[in-house]
Amino acid sequence: MATRAARVWSGWWLLLLPLLGLAGASGPRTLVLLDNLNLRETHSLFFRSLKDRGFVLTFKTADDPSLSLIKYGEFLYDNLIIFSPSVEDFGGNINVETISAFIDGGGSVLVAASSDIGDPLRELGSECGIEFDEEKTAVIDHHNYDVSDLGQHTLIVADTENLLKAPTIVGKSSLNPILFRGVGMVADPDNPLVLDILTGSSTSYSFFPDKPITQYPHAVGKNTLLIAGLQARNNARVIFSGSLDFFSDAFFNSAVQKAAPGSQRYSQTGNYELAVALSRWVFKEEGVLRVGPVSHHRVGETAPPNAYTVTDLVEYSIVIEQLSDGKWVPFDGDDIQLEFVRIDPFVRTFLKRKGGKYSVQFKLPDVYGVFQFKVDYNRLGYTHLYSSTQVSVRPLQHTQYERFIPSAYPYYASAFSMMLGLFIFSVVFLHMKEKEKSD
């Protein structure tokens, strides 16, 4: 009997183990695709920073036949990291179309390439408005290379002045120079969603480092992208780095100094701080906004009416929150606008922060119809914030009009004077008797 009870308990325990595992793995599920599993050791500092922030990492090689992003119409992961630049074919059910569908579904993707870039990453970049240079090419800069460069001038020292001016994306603290070795990119000029996060200097270009230049390079000067980003219209985020070494422990801990005479030497690069900041942004730990309670009413009242009347004085309030360290806190912004729209905006005004919310008072236009209170906030580095509340505005009722309008007094006077004149004329005409003519 005891043996049977032990077997039953053992069976229940086996059933509970997966549930306990799911309960423990409560962080963002992240699939990491690698060229080889040795990258877990050579890039351990970056992966450790993700684990310390609660990410649940699943490491697999990019050609693993069991790979899958979607199962039964549901995404198996929240984030995707591709550290396999040389992959020629993804394994399992993953391909460029699947990754594009993952992005369309709101997933976040971090891609690191290198000079040994394969066709899948090139196609994925094209889907996102990024064009990689050819295989075996590298970014070259004969004026801004590191002292440890082997002679091809492909170990680039990127100045922080070339970073995108967006603290939400690249971090708020000042950084040491960035060490970069990899392939160059250019952005599609017709894609307004692409972000030039880190560009090359004016003396940089992308070409084959072991061949003489016989044609115009693919990317030249400031058009050479070292790191690029994308925030889609559904707030999905993607980052492309032309360098896999950028995320390596060796580059994180390396000293950096330009080979130019008199250049300052730094004991450590700014790669780690920038990599952490980029990962926080792309995985939506930074720059995420949401709309809280929205209220509107006439000034002096507390509840919204069934319909407003033209020229009413109204008050509009909205709560906007920002995700910070896993908690929602009030957002601090001074450029949030409210529009009162029918077809075109009739009123556009700035919202002022009062306590934990933004509010404003304004007078409705002397136009009736169906209007919207609309907040459409779209700023660099932040998710797109949109709020729309529809209301009706009716004309004045008959009893709400003034009995006498001062501007109409002349017309009143003319009407009464005409009536008085007609009355006097009638009296005179009816009661006047003509004198009889005498013979």
Curated annotation (Swiss-Prot):
Residues 1-26 form the signal peptide. This is Dolichyl-diphosphooligosaccharide--protein glycosyltransferase 48 kDa subunit. Belongs to the DDOST 48 kDa subunit family. The lineage of its organism: Eukaryota, Metazoa, Chordata, Craniata, Vertebrata. The chain crosses the membrane at residues 410-430. Component of the oligosaccharyltransferase (OST) complex. OST exists in two different complex forms which contain common core subunits RPN1, RPN2, OST48, OST4, DAD1 and TMEM258, either STT3A or STT3B as catalytic subunits, and form-specific accessory subunits. STT3A complex assembly occurs through the formation of 3 subcomplexes. Subcomplex 1 contains RPN1 and TMEM258, subcomplex 2 contains the STT3A-specific subunits STT3A, DC2/OSTC, and KCP2 as well as the core subunit OST4, and subcomplex 3 contains RPN2, DAD1, and OST48. Keywords: Endoplasmic reticulum, Membrane, Signal, Transmembrane, Transmembrane helix. Residues 431-439 are cytoplasmic. It is found in: Endoplasmic reticulum membrane. Its main location: endoplasmic reticulum. It is a single-pass type I membrane protein. GO terms for biological process: protein glycosylation; protein N-linked glycosylation via asparagine. Subunit of the oligosaccharyl transferase (OST) complex that catalyzes the initial transfer of a defined glycan (Glc(3)Man(9)GlcNAc(2) in eukaryotes) from the lipid carrier dolichol-pyrophosphate to an asparagine residue within an Asn-X-Ser/Thr consensus motif in nascent polypeptide chains, the first step in protein N-glycosylation. N-glycosylation occurs cotranslationally and the complex associates with the Sec61 complex at the channel-forming translocon complex that mediates protein translocation across the endoplasmic reticulum (ER). All subunits are required for a maximal enzyme activity. Pathway: Protein modification; protein glycosylation. Residues 27-409 are lumenal. GO terms for cellular component: oligosaccharyltransferase complex. The gene is DDOST. InterPro entries: DDOST_48_kDa_subunit (IPR005013), OST48_MD (IPR055459), OST48_N (IPR055457).
